[in-house]
């Protein structure tokens, strides 16, 4: 798997920004088939940082109401929380 396809996008929410500021953890949406070793290698290669640990979570898509009677679902996705070593930083556009 290509490392550019492993990390899809960063998650920039209030909780993610607080985790970044307090404990140097960054949150990403990643490919569902990627494992922790692939995620660690992709982050270290793309952002030129040293990763301390990776935690992953499979998030189940929510059910939606589409139209009057039909039901639909959002896609399932995978979230990775990456903790960087001391003094490491990733420049993200999280200041709005």
Curated annotation (Swiss-Prot):
One of its GO terms (cellular component) is ribosome. Transmembrane segments: none annotated. The keyword Ribonucleoprotein applies. GO terms for molecular function: rRNA binding; structural constituent of ribosome. InterPro entries: Nucleotide-bd_a/b_plait_sf (IPR012677), Ribosomal_uL23-like (IPR013025), Ribosomal_uL23/eL15/eS24_sf (IPR012678). One of its GO terms (biological process) is translation. Keywords: Ribonucleoprotein, Ribosomal protein, RNA-binding, rRNA-binding. Part of the 50S ribosomal subunit. Contacts protein L29, and trigger factor when it is bound to the ribosome. HAMAP family: Ribosomal_uL23_B (MF_01369_B). One of the early assembly proteins it binds 23S rRNA. One of the proteins that surrounds the polypeptide exit tunnel on the outside of the ribosome. Forms the main docking site for trigger factor binding to the ribosome. Belongs to the universal ribosomal protein uL23 family. PANTHER family: 60S RIBOSOMAL PROTEIN L23A. This is Large ribosomal subunit protein uL23. The gene is rplW.
């Amino acid at each position: 798997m290509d490392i550019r396809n492993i990390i899809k996008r960063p998650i920039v929410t209030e909780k993610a920004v607080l985790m970044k500021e307090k404990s140097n953890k960054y949150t990403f949406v990643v490919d569902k088939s990627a494992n922790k070793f692939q995620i660690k290698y992709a982050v270290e290669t793309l952002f030129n940082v040293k990763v301390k640990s990776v935690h992953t979570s499979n998030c189940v898509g929510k059910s939606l109401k589409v139209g009057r009677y039909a039901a639909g679902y959002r896609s399932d996705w995978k979230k990775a929380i990456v903790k960087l070593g001391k003094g490491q930083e990733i420049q993200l556009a999280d200041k709005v």
